[in-house]
Structures are given as C-alpha cells and as structure tokens.
C-alpha cells in the first residue's frame, strides 16, 4: 500500500489539520516509509508465538482497599474565593 498526496490532504482535512503543499509532499514520503516498515513487520512469521502485553511477566501489587477522605479538602479549596465546609460557593445562576 502506498499513500499519495491526495490521500494525505484528505486525511488532514478529516483530522481538521491545515497542511500546505510542501508539508503534504513531505508527509507523503514519511507515511510511505512508515507503511513500508509495517509491511516488513507483516512478513515476520509469528506462528506459535503466544501473544503478550509485556516482555517481562509482571503482576500488579495489591493494596488494601480502604475508604479515606484523601486528606486534601483544605488543599483543594485553598485558592477558591469563597468556600463553606470544604465546598465551593458559587453565584446562583438558575432561578
């Protein structure tokens, strides 16, 4: 598969990215190089290779699940202009 300049412009338009003619031609070459590398990866025989998420088998460390208030209430409301009992006070906007 190869990418032409029209495809680059179309993808840029769909992504809402402004791309001028010079950048589009540069990106065409870069995308073709990336796709060439991916095609090389597709040629690798992975028959019998078990899928993995990490090179080294790891397990997540478990900790006790306990409920706390986070001890951050004062820090959270510290810069608020108005607070009351760790809640933000804001002007009423709906009658």
From Swiss-Prot:
Assembly description: Heterotrimer of A, B and C subunits.
GO molecular function: asparaginyl-tRNA synthase (glutamine-hydrolyzing) activity; ATP binding; glutaminyl-tRNA synthase (glutamine-hydrolyzing) activity
EC number: 6.3.5.-
Coiled-coil annotated spans: none
Catalytic activity: L-glutamyl-tRNA(Gln) + L-glutamine + ATP + H2O = L-glutaminyl-tRNA(Gln) + L-glutamate + ADP + phosphate + H(+); L-aspartyl-tRNA(Asn) + L-glutamine + ATP + H2O = L-asparaginyl-tRNA(Asn) + L-glutamate + ADP + phosphate + 2 H(+)
Organism superkingdom: Bacteria
GO biological process: glutaminyl-tRNAGln biosynthesis via transamidation; regulation of translational fidelity; translation
Protein name, UniProt field: Aspartyl/glutamyl-tRNA(Asn/Gln) amidotransferase subunit C
Alphabetically ordered keywords of this record: ATP-binding, Ligase, Nucleotide-binding, Protein biosynthesis
Function: Allows the formation of correctly charged Asn-tRNA(Asn) or Gln-tRNA(Gln) through the transamidation of misacylated Asp-tRNA(Asn) or Glu-tRNA(Gln) in organisms which lack either or both of asparaginyl-tRNA or glutaminyl-tRNA synthetases. The reaction takes place in the presence of glutamine and ATP through an activated phospho-Asp-tRNA(Asn) or phospho-Glu-tRNA(Gln).
Record-linked Pfam families: GatC
Signal sequence bounds: none
Enzyme class: ligase
Residue spans crossing the bilayer: none
UniProt-listed SUPFAM superfamilies: Glu-tRNAGln amidotransferase C subunit (SSF141000)
UniProt family annotation: Belongs to the GatC family.
